[in-house]
Swiss-Prot record:
It comes from Homo sapiens (Human). One of its GO terms (molecular function) is kinetochore binding. The gene is CENPH. The modification N-acetylmethionine is found at residue 1. It is found in: Nucleus; Chromosome, Centromere, Kinetochore. The keyword Nucleus applies. GO terms for cellular component: chromosome; cytosol; inner kinetochore; kinetochore; nucleolus; nucleoplasm; nucleus. This is Centromere protein H. Residues 24-34 have a biased composition (Low complexity). Component of the CENPA-NAC (nucleosome-associated) complex, a complex that plays a central role in assembly of kinetochore proteins, mitotic progression and chromosome segregation. The CENPA-NAC complex recruits the CENPA-CAD (nucleosome distal) complex and may be involved in incorporation of newly synthesized CENPA into centromeres. Required for chromosome congression and efficiently align the chromosomes on a metaphase plate. Self-associates. Component of the CENPA-NAC complex, at least composed of CENPA, CENPC, CENPH, CENPM, CENPN, CENPT and CENPU. The CENPA-NAC complex interacts with the CENPA-CAD complex, composed of CENPI, CENPK, CENPL, CENPO, CENPP, CENPQ, CENPR and CENPS. Interacts directly with CENPK. Interacts with KIF2C and NDC80. Interacts with TRIM36. The modification Phosphothreonine is found at residue 68. Residues 1-34 are annotated as: Disordered.
């Protein structure tokens, strides 16, 4: 990236006006390449930090007897974050290489144009081709810029999707936690002393009711009344035959 200023200084007496026009795109591309390098460095640092956090979480989990739902959720979120960062790093690397190739093409075209202008003023056809090549390079840079804009939008969509995924996982964790709490509360209620007393009283009432049923059945049968012909008495007998435990 330092060869261009030296070449421009050497050619400045011959054609200073053409240099001003041809120096613009490489400077813009150079600035974009530097920005891509800074971004890639930041992403690499974030990936290293995230991997370190994952190792710490794994060591903490291995030290415990079993994993809690919160720890499992944190591991999944960290793994998804690492995967997204790695994908983003690869995209930045590809974009950086494309920008570097475009910058090299611009430099080569500018250098060839200046050399051809010095060597021969009669090669107009070749000069036209070189100018056409420069125009094509500008169109390529424009298309690449549009492609990078689309990549930025795609990255935003992926971030939103990750946020929605994390929100849904957090909601599921809340639901599971609430279910576990309800189960614990139910178990504690079943094991409480008050529930035991209520159950004992209920069993006592069932036994008393069963004894009363048997007494009434024996009275009706002992009276030798034809209860099948009396609807009211028949209904009473049928009720007495029901098992109280099944009610």
């Amino acid at each position: 990236m330092e060869e261009q200023p030296q070449m421009q200084d050497a050619d400045e007496p011959a054609d200073s006006g053409g240099e001003g026009r041809a120096g613009g795109p490489p400077q813009v591309a150079g600035a974009q390449a530097a920005c891509s390098e800074d971004r890639m460095t930041l992403l690499l640092r974030l990936r290293a930090q995230t991997k370190q956090q994952l190792l710490e979480y794994k060591s903490m989990v291995d030290a415990s007897e079993e994993k809690t739902p919160e720890q499992i959720m944190q591991e999944k979120q960290i793994e998804a974050k690492i995967e997204d960062l790695e994908n983003e790093i690869e995209e930045v690397k590809v974009a950086f290489e494309i920008k570097k190739l475009a910058l090299d093409r611009m430099r080569l075209s500018t250098a060839l144009k200046k050399n051809l202008e010095k060597i021969s003023r009669q090669s107009s056809v070749l000069m036209d081709n070189m100018k056409h090549l420069l125009e094509l390079n500008k169109l390529i840079m424009k298309s690449q810029q549009e492609s990078w804009d689309l990549e930025e939008k795609l990255l935003d969509i992926r971030k939103k999707r990750l946020q929605l995924k994390q929100a849904s996982e957090s909601k599921l964790l809340e639901i599971q936690t609430e279910k576990n709490k309800q189960k614990i509360d139910l178990d504690s209620m079943e094991n409480s002393e008050r529930i035991k007393i209520i159950r004992q009283n209920l069993q006592m009432e069932i036994k008393i009711t069963t004894v009363i049923q048997h007494v009434f059945q024996n009275l009706i049968l002992g009276s030798k009344v034809n209860w099948a012909e009396d609807p009211a008495l028949k209904e009473i007998v049928l009720q007495l035959e029901k098992n109280v435990d099944m009610m």
